[in-house]
Amino acid sequence: MPYLSVAKFGGTSVANHDAMTACAKIVIADPNTRVVVLSASAGVTNLLVALANGVKATEREKLIGNDLHITSGVAKRIFDTVQSYNVRMISYGASTNNVCMLVQSEHSDEIVRSLHKSLFE
């Protein structure tokens, strides 16, 4: 019976492009990986702690909430655009302007063009 693999990456393992590429290779190498969990990139947790220590408790939610929004409808347009492809992972990065997807390399150019058309044309 095949097993279900859950891959979890965070910290320095998602700190930069090379590290993320290594994570992607791990996921692709195991066909039983069905769930990929990403936590904060290297240093993000420390930045959040510093933010929390430097701001009054009543201000924290407002300050953090200001950066954790996405323009109405953009997420739906992204999901609608990629629904016909085999997307193995979608992750928002440390910025709400950063969306990462793990897809088969032969479809990557087509997906990028489709997303560009959907979001910018």
From Swiss-Prot:
InterPro entries in alphabetical order: AceGlu_kinase-like_sf, ACT_Aspartokinase, AsparK_Bifunc_asparK/hSer_DH, Aspartate_kinase_CS, LysC_ACT_2
Disulphides: none
Domain of life: Bacteria
Record Gene3D superfamilies: Acetylglutamate kinase-like (3.40.1160.10), Aspartokinase, catalytic domain (1.20.120.1320)
A Pfam family it matches: ACT_9
Listed GO MF terms: aspartate kinase activity
GO biological process terms on file: amino acid biosynthetic process
Family statement drawn from the similarity comment of this UniProt entry: Belongs to the aspartokinase family.
PANTHER family to which the protein is assigned, alphabetical: ASPARTATE KINASE, ASPARTOKINASE
Name by which UniProt lists this protein: Putative inactive aspartokinase 3 HI_1632
Native organism: Haemophilus influenzae (strain ATCC 51907 / DSM 11121 / KW20 / Rd)
